[in-house]
Curated annotation (Swiss-Prot):
Keywords: Aminotransferase, Transferase. The lineage of its organism: Bacteria, Pseudomonadati, Bdellovibrionota, Bdellovibrionia, Bdellovibrionales. This is Aminomethyltransferase. Its EC number is 2.1.2.10. It is an enzyme of class 2 (transferase). It catalyses: N(6)-[(R)-S(8)-aminomethyldihydrolipoyl]-L-lysyl-[protein] + (6S)-5,6,7,8-tetrahydrofolate = N(6)-[(R)-dihydrolipoyl]-L-lysyl-[protein] + (6R)-5,10-methylene-5,6,7,8-tetrahydrofolate + NH4(+). GO terms for cellular component: cytosol; glycine cleavage complex. GO terms for molecular function: aminomethyltransferase activity; transaminase activity. It comes from the Bacteria. Coiled coil: none annotated.
Length: 360
């Protein structure tokens, strides 16, 4: 298993470690529910150093990223970021990503999913339009600082005034001599940021954040709570809501597809999927009867027709009830529509509901 720069730190602090996509990662510290609720009320730290970082530089950097991604990279100015997609040549998705503009037209950092890092790098290299593309994943650790008190903690630790940064921006600086990039992005629905730090400085930064945030209730958060937090927001996770066959419009990601820009990989087929009409939608749902939804469970109409599949499901710590995300036939996708969920041969009632499940 691969280890992040924080692996030894997690062990010393008593985290329960597991294999996650080939990485030795903390699934929880004191318990999923407590960690989840702490991020919703105080502040939590996430080790996201397993995520991949791909640098795209040079005179052809913008042209390359415009071709590789569905969103319009040309709109980004220095210090701005955007959520985007890497479309494949079959009408599905290689990955969902965040593009950070470090220097307009010529220097970008692309953050990719841990499980897709090698695949993404190979894809980007194969379809390069002449940029200098390098895998910088081993150079960086990454810590997400999330929660209502996250910005207060950041302002205590960093010279950069994070509380004054706009959402989806990035600034470069240093921490105890180590290069850092602070990005006001996240995966929880809370205020906060994600800090790229030179690998050698990651453990020191983690311990400093814990110490400086003690009175704010700061604690380490495992992958278990990271997943329940993102599920409550109906944020997509690759391998669940999206994969290499997903129609991005059906997944609710049409807002990051820009047909007006000159061209991108497989543009005609991707945009054509919307014009052809959608057959299913990605929706949130709640249970009306006892049961926890899990990925792969089938959805049925009341006349016993299979109408969809669960992509993610959990017991929501914030709402204290089971919630799920599913692809469902468009005829059943309207809020308030009831259906049956097959839980190991037992069919129980559920209802399509408004998302995100948790709002501030």
């Amino acid at each position: 298993m691969k280890k992040t720069p924080l692996a030894d730190t997690h062990e010393k602090l008593g985290a329960r470690m597991v294999d996650f996509a080939g990485w030795y990662m903390p699934v929880q510290y004191i318990g999923l529910r407590e960690e989840h609720n702490n991020v919703r009320t105080n502040v939590g730290l996430f080790d996201v150093s397993h995520m991949g970082e791909v640098r795209v530089k040079g005179p052809k950097a913008l042209e390359t990223l415009e071709w590789l991604t569905t969103n319009d990279v040309s709109k980004l100015n220095d210090g701005e970021a955007q959520y985007s997609l890497l479309p494949n040549d079959q009408g599905g998705l290689v990955d969902d990503i965040i593009v950070y503009c470090l220097s307009k037209d010529s220097d970008y950092l692309v953050c990719v999913n841990a499980s897709n890092k090698d695949k993404d790098f190979a894809w980007m290299t194969k379809h390069n339009k002449g940029a200098d593309i390098t895998d910088e994943s081993d150079l960086w650790g990454q810590i997400a600082i999330q929660g209502p008190k996250a910005l207060e903690l950041c302002d205590r630790v960093f010279d950069i005034k994070v509380s004054e940064m706009k959402s989806f921006t990035v600034k470069s600086g240093t921490f105890k001599g180590h290069k850092i990039m602070i990005a006001t992005t996240g995966y929880t629905g809370e205020k906060g940021c994600e800090v790229f730090v030179e690998a050698a400085g990651t453990a020191d930064l983690w311990m400093t954040l814990l110490e400086k945030g003690k009175d704010l209730g700061c604690m380490g958060i495992g992958l278990g709570a990271r997943d329940t937090l993102r599920t409550e927001m109906k944020y997509s996770l690759y391998g669940h809501e999206i994969d290499d066959t997903t129609n991005p419009y059906e997944a609710g990601l049409g807002w990051v597809i820009k047909p007006a820009k000159k061209d991108f990989m497989n543009k005609a087929q991707i945009v054509g999927k919307k014009e052809a009409g959608l057959t299913r939608n990605l929706v949130g749902f709640k249970m009306l009867e006892k049961g926890i939804p899990r990925q792969g469970y089938s959805l049925f109409s009341f006349d016993n027709k299979e109408i969809g599949k669960v992509t993610s499901g959990t017991h929501s710590p914030t709402l204290d009830e089971p919630i799920g995300i599913a692809f469902i036939d468009v005829a059943y996708a309207k809020e308030g529509t009831e259906f049956l969920l097959d839980i190991r041969g037992r069919k129980v009632k559920a209802v399509v509901c408004k998302t995100p499940f948790v709002t501030k």
